[in-house]
């Protein structure tokens, strides 16, 4: 899909599935430093082996923040000057993301709302999946604004 305007006819449809993205321990550690959240379940592999998770896991907010990257890997809109996050609804962290696992996102378009000629507001039902795991890591309603080039 090359145009943000093409989305208007796709409301209610799954519009894209991202490629897989690795959630490495390095990525988790970098996120921990950025947000100053050093809880051992995220950054201490030795101690985390004895946890209910059997190893370190990604922060829930790291998984949530990956939506931006996963969407960039999925969509390329030639008529978009820029996009901004507008908000989130109904976010749930439904399964832990183990260090070293791979995730991808499925994007279903829930709403498409024009912004008075300057762009559109879209609401995605986003589901982040973990490779080889039936239960999703995250489900969220993600609202973004996209401004025309």
Spell out what each predicted region is:
Residues 22-23, 46, 64, 70, ...:
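Residue-level detector of alpha-helical segments with a strong bias toward transmembrane helices
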């Amino acid at each position: 899909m090359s145009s943000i305007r093409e989305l208007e006819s796709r409301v209610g449809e799954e519009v894209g599935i991202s490629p897989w993205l690795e959630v490495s321990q390095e990525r988790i550690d970098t996120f921990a430093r950025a947000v100053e959240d050093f809880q051992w379940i995220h950054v201490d592999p030795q101690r985390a082996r004895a946890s209910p998770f059997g190893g370190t896991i990604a922060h829930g907010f790291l998984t949530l923040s990956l939506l931006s990257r996963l969407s960039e890997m999925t969509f390329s809109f030639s008529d978009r000057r820029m996009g901004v996050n507008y908000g989130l609804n109904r976010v749930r962290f439904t399964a832990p993301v183990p260090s070293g696992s791979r995730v991808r996102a499925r994007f279903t378009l829930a709403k498409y709302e024009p912004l008075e000629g300057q762009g559109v507001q879209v609401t995605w039902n986003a589901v982040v999946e973990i490779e080889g795991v039936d239960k999703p890591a995250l489900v969220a309603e993600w609202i973004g604004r996209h401004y025309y080039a």
